[in-house]
Amino acid sequence: MDSETVLSVTDLGSCCRRLGWALGMTTAVVANAAEVSVAVAANFAAPMQAIAQAFEQDTGHKAVLAFGSSGSFYAQIMNGAPFQVLLAADATTPEQLEKAALAVPGSRFTYATGRLVLWSKQAAGVDANGAVLRAGSFRKLAVANPKLAPYGAAAYETLQSLGLLQSLRGRLVEGQNIGQAYQFVASGNAELGLLALSQVYVEGRLSQGSGWIVPAHLHRPITQAAVLLKAGRDQPAALALLAYLKGAKALSVMRAYGYEP
């Protein structure tokens, strides 16, 4: 046997110790990893999926995501749904849950401010000033249910500010959440939609189609708040996720999708 390949008893013991230490570290990471159940407003689906992936890579914790309207999640949580963290599309829902003793006091914070966009999947469907709304050259305009989804409320406020709500009311088609409103437009069931900018915006530009970013003064600010729910109290993964949302990586993702952190 070549002398260069011979391991002494001392060398072998040292290798085993190093291997045991490495395995121990791996076991420790796995042992400390946990899951967090997160209720996510539909408008935040795409950025949250990216954030959750980075969160798992960086911490070992896994975020199990459910998407829907803030109003629907409020009802589910009030009825005992075991979510640990809520990322709402408004500030009111987390505040109401805190008042109902279903959220941890002091854990609520604004994680993003959303923007509304008038969008068409057609390249020339929407002009730069949104004049297509006044022209009326469309059959259906998709919006989210304003009673359940803050982006739906912002859509109605925008139409009201433009003096178009009454004239366009018969053309509105409502989705239960902003995700369903997007599907109406993407499937061709509605030519236009007042949607969350994040649904059609990536890396500083529209991913497809055409759109008009609605001026912020036409509706109340879409302030989106996160809160630690009662089921997440003292849960390491839940606490880690809320901290992660305030970090540079998460904020960078939000900006790429058109949010104002």
Segments (PLM) and residue ranges:
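N-terminal secretory signal peptides that target proteins for export/translocation
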Residues: 1-15
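Generic short amphipathic/hydrophobic targeting helices enriched at N-termini
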Residues: 2-5, 25-26, 32
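N-terminal non-cleavable signal-anchor helices
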Residues: 7-10, 30-31, 214
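Bacterial N-terminal signal peptides
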Residues: 11, 17-29
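Residue-level micro-sites within transmembrane alpha helices that shape
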Residues: 16-17, 190
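Exported/periplasmic ABC-transporter solute-binding proteins
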Residues: 33-81, 88-91, 95-261
